[in-house]
């Protein structure tokens, strides 16, 4: 196709057709995960489940991404397809378990299974995208994945708005409808691995069982991941617990926080459309720094906000700005890694981000349980500012490769 014609059609026209279908296949998993997150963080507190327990479940799920490192090595050596299929196939199990009980022991088991599923998917997904793209279409590919992913999660966040209507139509209690809807979402999530299996039938990989674990770019990976982990550490104090914070501070149920998270994710998805254009104009590093920096200002403002509607508006803006940097960061890391290093690189970056995030989520839940609703935002702001400064100073002269 003529390059000028392709440019007029937009950035996303450059993405391989099969990759687009792979991105769409994850929609069913993501919708289910979206509703599950609202169920855990907004509906559980309504049932009287302590914020500390909510933080523990989220933290345990996140901690399981430690498995991403050995799974990432395995994906580089043996191939990525099987691991992705296994990970997406596990997702329905914990969702249905959580719908059927509030027994803490069972919930812990479910959180661990969900973490294992996420580890298998995260250790392969970014590498699969990078393997099928070049420097010309990589930013657009990661952005489309980010947009579709966040849009489908947003749909899951929105589902609690249906519950009052379903109550009036069926006469069932809110608790039963919440639970039945989560079971339905678990069943819907099973569509993803079936669809992926069909799409990936002809996907060819070249296993490299003798490949060295540490490649030439390993020091760069450790530096990038270490700095990025400070974002994860700061975010953990409050971001996964936003619905819990809204309920405890303002008394808002999931019929408010669910749509707010949905609006936030839709805004994030729309904002990510601009990500490739911003990086094309200013460069990846400057684009990442600018979006994260402006987001941090809005993060700080949430510590002092007195009104729930204002809090919702500020949170949406903060989320959109911060997450515009998400696909750009993924694209940047995959661009500075060789093809043979990408599975491990994606895994290490995920683990180093999620482990601190998981720990501080538990701490954040405990802080919220004491009634100190501002401290988590102050802590998050400090770590964001340190990470953004270090990222710019360390990576401003390092360019991605094809």
Predicted regions and their residues:
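Helix-loop boundary and gating motifs at the non-cytosolic
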Residues: 8-65, 222-261
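Hydrophobic core of transmembrane alpha-helices in multi-pass small-molecule transporters
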Residues: 27, 94, 105-121, 310-324
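Central cavity-lining transmembrane alpha-helices of secondary-active solute carriers
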Residues: 56-73, 262-274
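Helix-to-loop junctions at the C-terminal end of transmembrane segments
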Residues: 67-79, 271-284, 368-369
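Structural signature of the two symmetry-related core transmembrane helices
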Residues: 82-97, 286-301, 378-381
């Amino acid at each position: 196709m003529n390059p000028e014609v392709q440019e007029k059609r937009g950035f996303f026209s450059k993405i391989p057709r099969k990759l687009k279908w792979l991105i769409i296949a994850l929609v069913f998993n993501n919708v289910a995960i979206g509703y599950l997150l609202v169920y855990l963080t907004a509906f559980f507190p309504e049932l009287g489940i302590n914020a500390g327990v909510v933080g523990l479940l989220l933290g345990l799920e996140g901690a399981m991404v430690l498995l991403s490192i050995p799974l990432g090595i395995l994906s580089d050596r043996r191939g990525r397809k099987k691991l992705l299929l296994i990970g997406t196939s596990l997702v329905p199990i914990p969702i249905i378990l959580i719908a059927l009980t509030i027994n803490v022991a069972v919930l812990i088991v479910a959180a661990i299974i969900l973490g294992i599923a996420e580890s298998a998917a995260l250790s392969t997904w970014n590498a699969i995208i990078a393997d099928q793209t070049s420097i010309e279409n990589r930013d657009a590919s990661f952005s489309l994945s980010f947009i579709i992913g966040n849009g489908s999660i947003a749909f899951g966040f929105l589902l609690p708005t249906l519950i009052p209507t379903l109550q009036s139509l069926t006469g069932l209690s809110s608790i039963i409808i919440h639970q039945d809807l989560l079971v339905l979402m678990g069943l819907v999530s099973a569509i993803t691995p079936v669809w992926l299996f069909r799409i990936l039938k002809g996907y060819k990989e070249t296993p490299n069982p003798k490949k060295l674990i540490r490649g030439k770019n390993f020091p760069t990976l450790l530096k990038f991941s270490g700095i990025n982990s400070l974002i994860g550490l700061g975010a953990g104090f409050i971001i996964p617990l936003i619905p819990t914070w809204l309920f405890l501070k303002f008394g808002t149920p999931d019929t408010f926080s669910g749509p707010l998270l949905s609006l936030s994710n839709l805004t994030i998805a729309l904002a990510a459309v601009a990500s490739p254009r911003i990086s094309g104009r200013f460069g990846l590093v400057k684009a990442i720094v600018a979006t994260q920096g402006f987001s941090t200002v809005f993060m700080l403002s949430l510590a002092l906000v007195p009104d729930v509607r204002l809090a919702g508006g500020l949170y949406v803006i903060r989320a959109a700005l911060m997450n515009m940097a998400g696909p750009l960061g993924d694209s940047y890391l995959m661009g500075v890694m060789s093809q043979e290093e990408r599975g491990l690189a994606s895994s290490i970056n995920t683990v180093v981000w999620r482990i601190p995030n998981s720990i501080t989520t538990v701490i954040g839940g405990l802080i919220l349980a004491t009634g100190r609703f501002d401290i988590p935002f102050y802590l998050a702001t400090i770590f964001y500012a340190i990470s953004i400064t270090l990222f710019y100073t360390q990576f401003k002269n390092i360019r991605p490769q094809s």
